[in-house]
Swiss-Prot record:
Record keyword Protein biosynthesis present: no
Source organism of the structure: Bacillus mycoides (strain KBAB4) (Bacillus weihenstephanensis)
Xref: CDD domains: Ribosomal_L13 (cd00392)
Lineage: Bacteria, Bacillati, Bacillota, Bacilli, Bacillales
Stated name of the protein: Large ribosomal subunit protein uL13
Keyword Ribosomal protein among record annotations: yes
Record-level GO BP terms: negative regulation of translation; translation
SUPFAM superfamilies noted in UniProt: Ribosomal protein L13 (SSF52161)
Length: 145
């Protein structure tokens, strides 16, 4: 009888990828990066095991949003004090917090639980073109489309 292959966490081979966000659309970049982090691009993908690779995103400050989202899209957060609802537009987020903007988009596409928290630790986002992960010899990942 044949059995379905199940990957084991200690047998997974992980690669490092660099993705340049300059001129890329936020959602299209985020879906592909979330898929890499999860390991869905591998034939050994197992839903309950972290089979994904590490991803480094550079030039987060140069991400592109379509339509009028720079002014219309609003990011909400709460200070946990009464009346503490704060809001920022996507333009404010891109100029002041570009790393957080990308992290929020990608983490929203990952599982909500222990596996999602473990997978999100393999995401490294940098606003500029420099990153401190040269020792890992990351490969440049070309996005589809």
């Amino acid at each position: 009888m044949r059995t379905t292959f199940m990957a084991k966490a200690n047998e997974v081979e992980r690669k490092w990828y660099v993705v340049d966000a300059e001129g890329q659309t936020l959602g299209r970049l985020s879906t592909e990066v979330a898929s890499i982090l999860r390991g869905k691009h591998k034939p050994t993908f197992t839903p309950h095991v972290d089979t994904g690779d590490h991803v480094i995103i550079i030039n987060a400050e140069k991400i592109h949003l379509t339509g009028n989202k720079l002014n219309d899209k609003i990011y909400y957060r709460h200070t946990n004090h009464p009346g503490g609802l704060k809001q920022r537009t996507a333009l404010e987020m891109r100029t002041n917090y570009p790393v957080q903007m990308l992290e929020l988009a990608i983490k929203g596409m990952l599982p909500k639980g222990r596996l999602g928290r473990q997978v999100s630790k393999k995401l490294n986002v940098y606003a500029g073109a420099e990153h401190p992960h040269q020792a890992q010899q990351p490969e440049v990942y070309e996005l589809r489309g």
